Amino acid sequence: MGASQKNQELIGGLILFSAALLAIVVNNSPLASYYAMLETINVKLGIENLVIDKNLMHWINDGLMAIYFLYIGLEIKREIIVGTLSKPSNIITPAIAAFAGLAMPSLIYLSINHDIKVINGWAIPSATDIAFTLGILALLGTRVPAKLKLLVITIAIFDDIAAIAIIAIFYTKSLSLLSLSLGTLFILAMIICNRIFKINRSSVYVVLGFFAWFCTIKSGVHATLAGFTTALCIPFRENDKDSPANFMEDSLHPWIIYFILPVFAFANAGISFSGISFSILFEPITLGIILGLFVGKQLGIFSILAVFKKLKWFKLGESFSNLQLYGISLLCGIGFTMSLFIGVLAFNDTHLLNAIKIGVVVGSVLSGFFGYIVLRFIVTNPS
């Protein structure tokens, strides 16, 4: 990771945090009525009967986040072909750690939340916000070795893959087989353009990807799946920055960290404190998310990394201390944008959404703060 990219990650993390803070301030000020317009102003896209009519909040969550998952897909494809995921030996431990980091928070949440009305939120504390995490890693600089950062990124990649699967399987509320079939045809068209006709024009995949996204929204499956599958269909060539996948990933990166994620954070993090008491922190849903992110994530990930290191099943881990592994396990508890995103998909009740936002913010802040403290002040030998 070059110096300029490190600066981008740091600045992106700060902008993301500022956007979330601004949302909370605005939603608890005289400007709150304007903030509410995100859910009252509708925008239409389409012609005649082929129209998508959604409010601004939905456009952000279904449109901008589909672009974010397109970027994630491009990143994962590169890692599978030429990156850390191209070697099986580099995959096994981070994959199992990511799974444990998904399972443990979910189990903690479900152990606290037995009401059928809130069980659907089990996946909220299972996510990791890679943008925020990379921002803190950039802030730590050389205190975190490059290989340790690579381990965090690899775990986060598997976390993202799991999140995509969870959204597609568990948060699809209705299904139109006709629209889904049409979307699948556009995906197949991209595969044919790539594998058979060897078309390398990015614009072709952008147009076909847009129609795949449009059909996916109409089908009832969440649009993020269209973004991810589109990425897997785009041609990638090693050592060629002009290949469509490389070009699109490089082009999207600044838009993701400086615009898309901050806009999402601003739209979804606006906790309203009106009528809320301190006791909301101890409501089952809030407590389940806080403990899931802060306790479940670190417990699940660190236990796997430490045990595999002890058994010498984790070659890369031998160069790290247990404190370093514990520090990055804490950072993986920063759920923020991804946790908020799953929360919005799971519920639409205002009180529950407020409880979710508080749980996500508190759990993420605790994880980020203590992860930073461990890696910055307690780890004595970062090399």
UniProtKB/Swiss-Prot annotation:
It is found in: Cell inner membrane. It catalyses: Na(+)(in) + 2 H(+)(out) = Na(+)(out) + 2 H(+)(in). The keyword Ion transport applies. This is Na(+)/H(+) antiporter NhaA. Keywords: Antiport, Cell inner membrane, Cell membrane, Ion transport, Membrane, Sodium, Sodium transport, Transmembrane, Transmembrane helix, Transport. Belongs to the NhaA Na(+)/H(+) (TC 2.A.33) antiporter family. Signal peptide: none annotated. GO terms for cellular component: plasma membrane.
